[in-house]
């Protein structure tokens, strides 16, 4: 028990002794620190009075100088009294966390590479922040430091720009007790912002805030406007491209219609060639029929001359009379349907020349239209190639090439439509002119032949332009209208010849079979009337009057004696009305003669009341005044004396005209003759 008490007392005494020693040691340290603090304060005050003597008595300025001195001490790592470039760069990177301190470094040093405490204090006094008012400091606190909750505290303390260095150093009394900042992050943030402001001046954000806001707003407006403009231009470009594609499709359709028209022209050309071949065959067939008619007429003539039976001759004469009458009826009908005005041959050549000149002008217009079409196609292909590039759509939308190509397409389309319409109108117009004039105009020997035929100076016509081979048309469109089937070539061959040719050519085979005796003169009258059609209107008028007077006064006998049928037909005029009147008179006389023969079929030749009783109608009659019933040669007729002296001469002239009528019908180069089939081969009994 005693031992334990003693141990406890020894321990308590040791503790008290150790505590006393520690208290004495701390007291001695406090005295030493107080003495050193007093010494540092005295040295700081002396240095401040040396640097800035007018402000060395101001307590606030002393605190600010001490804060600047502490900042300089933080930056001076080697404690040599100067801050060099390396030390400032290290301080900016490590303490202020500047990754690119080039601007701040140049602002801090300037031209002086070593910064002392005096240099740092003078720089601080020259700074704009040193002269800040309380409001400016509060504005800096709100906008730059972003601590608006301490605004009231700053206003109560009336902190100006002079107190900024005290905020830049670590001072627990200032930040904790005076400013009442309990949040450590707020104290650190305020210290860093104040240190940056003291060393490098006021922040740029504070000085140029409005300018930057204005520039930001302007940039946003420009960006939005640019996006909107790009959107509008893109939409306009798409719409324009759609419109251009529609125009291209319309142009392709017009081109296709022109190709279709070209194909139709080719088909019409083939039909035209087929019709020409058929026309040649038909002409050959008609010539064969004419030869057959001539042979039949010769056969009838031989039968009439070889028989001695009057009834047989009368029968053949009646058959011949019926055929002639039928031919006259056909000629009369054709004369009624075609009794119109006949254009002169010179008009045909002039119209053909006019057509060729119009074709030249049409070819020039067509070539221009096709050239515009090629240019528009090339422009469209270029735009398509540009659209495939990276900025092609934007470039096309902002350039004028799209409008130019669109204009070229519309121009080419309009020109192509005009050429197509002009082609159709020209073909229709020349077809109507051919129908009205009755001859071919589109199919002609060519402009050079026409110029030579009309005796025109070639210099008036100019030089014809060659047809280019690189155009769209596969064939020569210069002769489009010539490839169209002429309306005259599609008609019947009988309609292509004039009325004068219809009345003339079918009589090639009637040459010598019309020389009958007085008993056969009634039947041969109608046949001989169609031997010739010559342009002799005065003779035709007299012949028609003689025929009418003879028929009305003394029957058909005086008609035969007074007017020979060959001379009557020879005097047919060109006038359709007068020719029609003559044919009607001849039909009346033929009908009357035929009725008289039917009333007296059994009367012998010597006692016929229609003939002169003093003349014989036998082929063996010895009377020299009796006309030959055979009439097979003009020499035999010229050697005999007839009762009517001029009758034989006119008949001889008719035979001569009949021999050369084939050559006369082919003398006109502009017209082709198609004779009528007026004889039918009678059945042999």
UniProtKB/Swiss-Prot annotation:
Acts as a Ca(2+) sensor that gates two major inward rectifying Ca(2+) channels at the plasma membrane: Ca(2+) release-activated Ca(2+) (CRAC) channels and arachidonate-regulated Ca(2+)-selective (ARC) channels. Plays a role in mediating store-operated Ca(2+) entry (SOCE), a Ca(2+) influx following depletion of intracellular Ca(2+) stores. Upon Ca(2+) depletion, translocates from the endoplasmic reticulum to the plasma membrane where it activates CRAC channel pore-forming subunits ORA1, ORA2 and ORAI3 to generate sustained and oscillatory Ca(2+) entry. Involved in enamel formation. SMART domains: SAM (SM00454). Residues 235-685 are cytoplasmic. The lineage of its organism: Eukaryota, Metazoa, Chordata, Craniata, Vertebrata. GO terms for biological process: activation of store-operated calcium channel activity; detection of calcium ion; enamel mineralization; establishment of localization in cell; intracellular calcium ion homeostasis; ligand-gated ion channel signaling pathway; monoatomic cation transport; myotube differentiation. Its main location: membrane. Ca(2+) binds at residues 76, 78, 80, 82, 87. Residues 64-97, 102-126 form the EF-hand domain. Residues 515-532 have a biased composition (Basic and acidic residues). Residues 1-22 form the signal peptide. One of its GO terms (cellular component) is microtubule. This is Stromal interaction molecule 1. It is found in: Cell membrane; Endoplasmic reticulum membrane; Sarcoplasmic reticulum; Cytoplasm, Cytoskeleton. Residues 23-213 are extracellular. One of its GO terms (molecular function) is calcium ion binding. Residues 670-685 have a biased composition (Basic residues). Residues 24-43, 490-542, 596-685 are annotated as: Disordered.
């Amino acid at each position: 028990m005693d031992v334990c008490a003693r141990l406890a007392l020894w321990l308590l005494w040791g503790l008290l002794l150790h505590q006393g020693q520690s208290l004495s040691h701390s007291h001695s340290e406090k005295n030493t620190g107080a003495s050193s603090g007093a010494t540092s304060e005295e040295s700081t005050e002396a240095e401040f009075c040396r640097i800035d003597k007018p402000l060395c008595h101001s307590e606030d300025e002393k605190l600010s100088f001490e804060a600047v001195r502490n900042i300089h001490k933080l930056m001076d790592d080697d404690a040599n009294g100067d801050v060099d470039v390396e030390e400032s760069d290290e301080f900016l990177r490590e303490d202020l966390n500047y990754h690119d301190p080039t601007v701040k470094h140049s602002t801090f040093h300037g031209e002086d590479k070593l910064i002392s405490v005096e240099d740092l204090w003078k720089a601080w006094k020259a700074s704009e922040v040193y002269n800040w008012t309380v409001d400016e400091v509060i504005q800096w606190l709100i906008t730059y430091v972003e601590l608006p909750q301490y605004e009231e505290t700053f206003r109560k303390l009336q902190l100006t720009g002079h107190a900024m260095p005290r905020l830049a150093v670590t001072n627990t009394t200032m930040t904790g007790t005076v400013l009442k900042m309990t949040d450590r992050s707020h104290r650190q943030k305020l210290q860093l912002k104040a240190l940056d402001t003291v060393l490098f001046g006021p922040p740029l954000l504070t000085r140029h805030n409005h300018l930057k806001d204005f520039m930001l707003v302007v940039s946003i407006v420009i960006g939005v406007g640019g996006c909107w403009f790009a959107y509008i231009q893109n939409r306009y470009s798409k719409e324009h491209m759609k419109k251009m594609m529609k125009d291209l499709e319309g142009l392709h359709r017009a081109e296709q219609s022109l190709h279709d028209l070209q194909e139709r022209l080719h088909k019409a050309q083939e039909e035209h060639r087929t019709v020409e071949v058929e026309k040649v065959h038909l002409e050959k067939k008609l010539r064969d029929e004419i030869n057959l008619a001539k042979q039949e007429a010769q056969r009838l003539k031989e039968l009439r001359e070889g028989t001695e039976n009057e009834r047989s001759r009368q029968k053949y004469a009646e058959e011949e009379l019926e055929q002639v009458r039928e031919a006259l009826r056909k000629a009369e009908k054709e004369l009624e349907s075609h009794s119109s005005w006949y254009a002169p041959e010179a008009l045909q050549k002039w119209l053909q020349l006019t057509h060729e000149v119009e074709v030249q002008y049409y070819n020039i217009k067509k070539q221009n239209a096709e050239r515009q079409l090629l240019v528009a196609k090339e422009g469209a292909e270029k735009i398509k190639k540009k659209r495939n590039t990276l900025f092609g759509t934007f470039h096309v939308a902002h350039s004028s090439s799209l409008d130019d190509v669109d204009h070229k397409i519309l121009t080419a389309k309009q020109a192509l439509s005009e050429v197509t319409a002009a082609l159709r109108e020209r073909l229709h117009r020349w077809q109507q002119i051919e129908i009205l004039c009755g001859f071919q105009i589109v199919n002609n020997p060519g402009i050079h032949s026409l110029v030579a035929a009309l005796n025109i100076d070639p210099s008036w016509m100019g030089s014809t332009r060659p047809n280019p081979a690189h155009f769209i048309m596969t064939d020569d469109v210069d002769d489009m209208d010539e490839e169209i089937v002429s309306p005259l070539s599609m008609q019947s061959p009988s309609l292509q010849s004039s009325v004068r040719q219809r009345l003339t050519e079918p009589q090639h085979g009637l040459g010598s079979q019309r020389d009958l005796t007085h008993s056969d003169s009634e039947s041969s009258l109608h046949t001989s009337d169609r031997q010739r059609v010559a342009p002799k209107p005065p003779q035709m008028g007299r012949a028609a009057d003689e025929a009418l007077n003879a028929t009305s006064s003394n029957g058909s006998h005086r008609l035969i004696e007074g007017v020979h049928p060959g001379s009557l037909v020879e005097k047919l005029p060109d006038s359709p009305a007068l020719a029609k009147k003559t044919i009607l008179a001849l039909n009346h006389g033929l009908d009357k003669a035929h009725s008289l023969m039917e009333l007296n079929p059994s009367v012998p030749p010597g006692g016929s009341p229609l003939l002169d009783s003093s003349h014989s109608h036998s082929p063996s009659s010895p009377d020299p005044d009796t006309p030959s019933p055979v009439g097979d040669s003009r020499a035999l007729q010229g050697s005999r004396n007839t009762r009517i002296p001029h009758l034989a001469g006119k008949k001889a002239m008719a035979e001569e005209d009949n021999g050369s009528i084939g050559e006369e019908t082919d003398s006109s180069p502009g017209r082709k003759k198609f004779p009528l089939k007026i004889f039918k081969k009678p059945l042999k009994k």
